[in-house]
Structure formats: C-alpha cells, structure tokens
Amino acid sequence: MTISPRDEQNRSVDLWFAYKVPKLTKDTDSDSATGYEYVYYDREIGSVQKSPNRMNNPKGALFYTLDSIFGDPGSTTGWILYNDEMPADADRSNNATLGHTKGVIAFDIASNSALWLLHSWPKYTSPSAPGVPTPLYGQTFLCVSLDLETAGKIAAQMALHQQPQVYLPRTAGLDHASPLYTLTQPLNASAPGDSDSLDFKTRGGAPFKVIAKNRKWGKDFWNDLVGPTLKADMDVETWIRGKIPPILDSDGVHKTYDIKFIDLRKLGAPWAWPETQDHAKWGITTTDDWVCVGDINRMVTQEKRGGGTIAFQDPQLWKALSQTDLIVPPPGKTEAQARAMIHRTHQPAD
C-alpha cells in the first residue's frame, strides 16, 4: 500500500493545501457558511479554487487522504497522530508542557512511503471516528508526500524541538531504533532543544523547510525565527488571544505583521471574515513567494510552547494568499489604513 496525499478526485498527488472557512452569517462582506466549506490547491490544478465539497461530507481531499490511511490499513501501515487538544477517544489529559502542534504522520513500511498532514484543527483526528470537530473558526491544512527516511528525519526533529502530544499511534512493526518509533514513546521533557530548520524534499522532488522551536527557546516563533530564517518581511495569520510580540524581527531589519482580515472573494469564493474568526496558522513573505503553514500562534504565551511551520516557495499559492490577507484591506480601507490599523491594535511585549 502506497501512502500519499489524495486530491479532490481521490487521485494521488505530491501535495495539497486547503483553507476551511469559519461559520459565517450573511452580511455585506460575505455569504453565509456552515463552517465546513473550503478552498483547495494542488500543483496539478495550479490555482486556489472553491471546493464543491464540505469537510463534514465523505468527499474531498481531506476525507480521501485519511480514509486511504484509516479505512483498511495493511499490516505495514501505521500512523502518528498528535494534537495539543486531543479528541475524546484519546482518553488522556492534555499536557501543556508539550508542543502546540497538530498533525498526522502516516507511513507504510513495505512501500517506503509516507505523508505528513500539518493542520490547525483542535481535537482532530481519530482512526476510529475521523469526523470533524467544531466548524466555528477558519483552519488550514497542508499535506505532503514523503519517503520513510525523510519522515524519520522530520520525526527526529519533532522529538527534540516541537515535542508533540502523541495519541493512539500505530507502529506497524517499526524498528524500535527508528525516529518514527521514538516519537510514539514518552518524550524527554528536559531535552535540550533550541530552534531548528530542516530542509527536505517530497517524493515528487519539491523542496521544503521545516522551521521549528523547542519551548525552552523562549522567543517568538514567527518574529524571531521564521522571518529571519527566510530573510523577509512577513504577513502572518494566527489565533491571537493575548499579548503580541513586537512587529520588528529580532534581526532588526525585517517586520512581521499580524493579519486582521481574510478575504477569499478575489479567488472566486464568496467569503470574508476578521481574524477573530480564524484559528489558522499561516504566513507569507512579502517577497520571494514563501508560504508557511504551521501550528503555533504569534502570542507571547506561545514562547513557552514548542511548534513549527512548513515553509515552501510556490508562486501560485503565494499570489493567491497575498490577495486574501491584510494587503487586501478590510472593506472601505486602503492598504495604508490596514497597516495603520495593525499598529494601533498592536500589543507589544513588555
């Protein structure tokens, strides 16, 4: 059995991205939404498109991908599920000292294949009941293909830096010396993790970076690590419910702006919403076409949590997302007014 991301027609692809819409009531800025609609992108279709599917129905890339893993797994197929808020059937308490991380690593030993689904949805997912939790907020998903060696390198980084809260793993005969197996075991909370950037390629040869930090690093992930690593100014959308770090990056050159409004209407989808209705964790650089999809927020309190993002250059996806964020200002506002709004509402760290 070959493990790979599945697209909207249940075909194997190298990667896909999806942005789930929050639950919305119809107003002058947006159509109503149930909270399960989404836009979808992969490099085969080459553009971000409004999906005809919903995430609470047995169709679409997310459903097909997880069903290919959990539906009828062979003896050599396994998975590592992790989330900072676990589903009910995980039957364990959340551990706030572990990473603010959410995702799935699935693998098949016999076919030397794997995938990584990194997302922002709390309490998701479960092998026995891979349904969907709350529709209230916007969420992001990125799924990429891997081979076992690459999956192992990512697992080794995660064990040391992100330190995810793993639940309901299926090891499927993994060698106990494998980093994938190690990730399923209790993690060393005193591990001397710092920050890290790991380059990897998908099975299709597409280059990516995993940028990650350990909770002991003690700095803002986006401001002090991602922006300087990519050497660019950034616009970042995350869940903000508290004090925000400074706008100026630690390198004293680049800036990180917090997105205040998401507008999908230029992409042919009839939805727009403020960041207060968004739980996604993504960012784009203002130059060089970098896209980041992650699982950690830009808040001072998150400096004490591990987490990471997948960064990659994709001109089509970058162009689409750059049209949806604060650069397309809220209705009736210019770009300059949108930037000024960020400065006015900003709560810098003490």
Swiss-Prot record:
It comes from the Bacteria. This is Putative deoxyribonuclease-2. Keywords: Endonuclease, Hydrolase, Nuclease. Its EC number is 3.1.-.-. Unlike their eukaryotic orthologs the putative Burkholderia deoxyribonuclease-2 are probably not secreted from the cell, as they do not have a signal sequence. It is an enzyme of class 3 (hydrolase). Belongs to the DNase II family. Transmembrane segments: none annotated. GO terms for molecular function: deoxyribonuclease II activity. InterPro entries: DNase_II. Pfam families: DNase_II (PF03265). Disulfide bonds: none annotated.
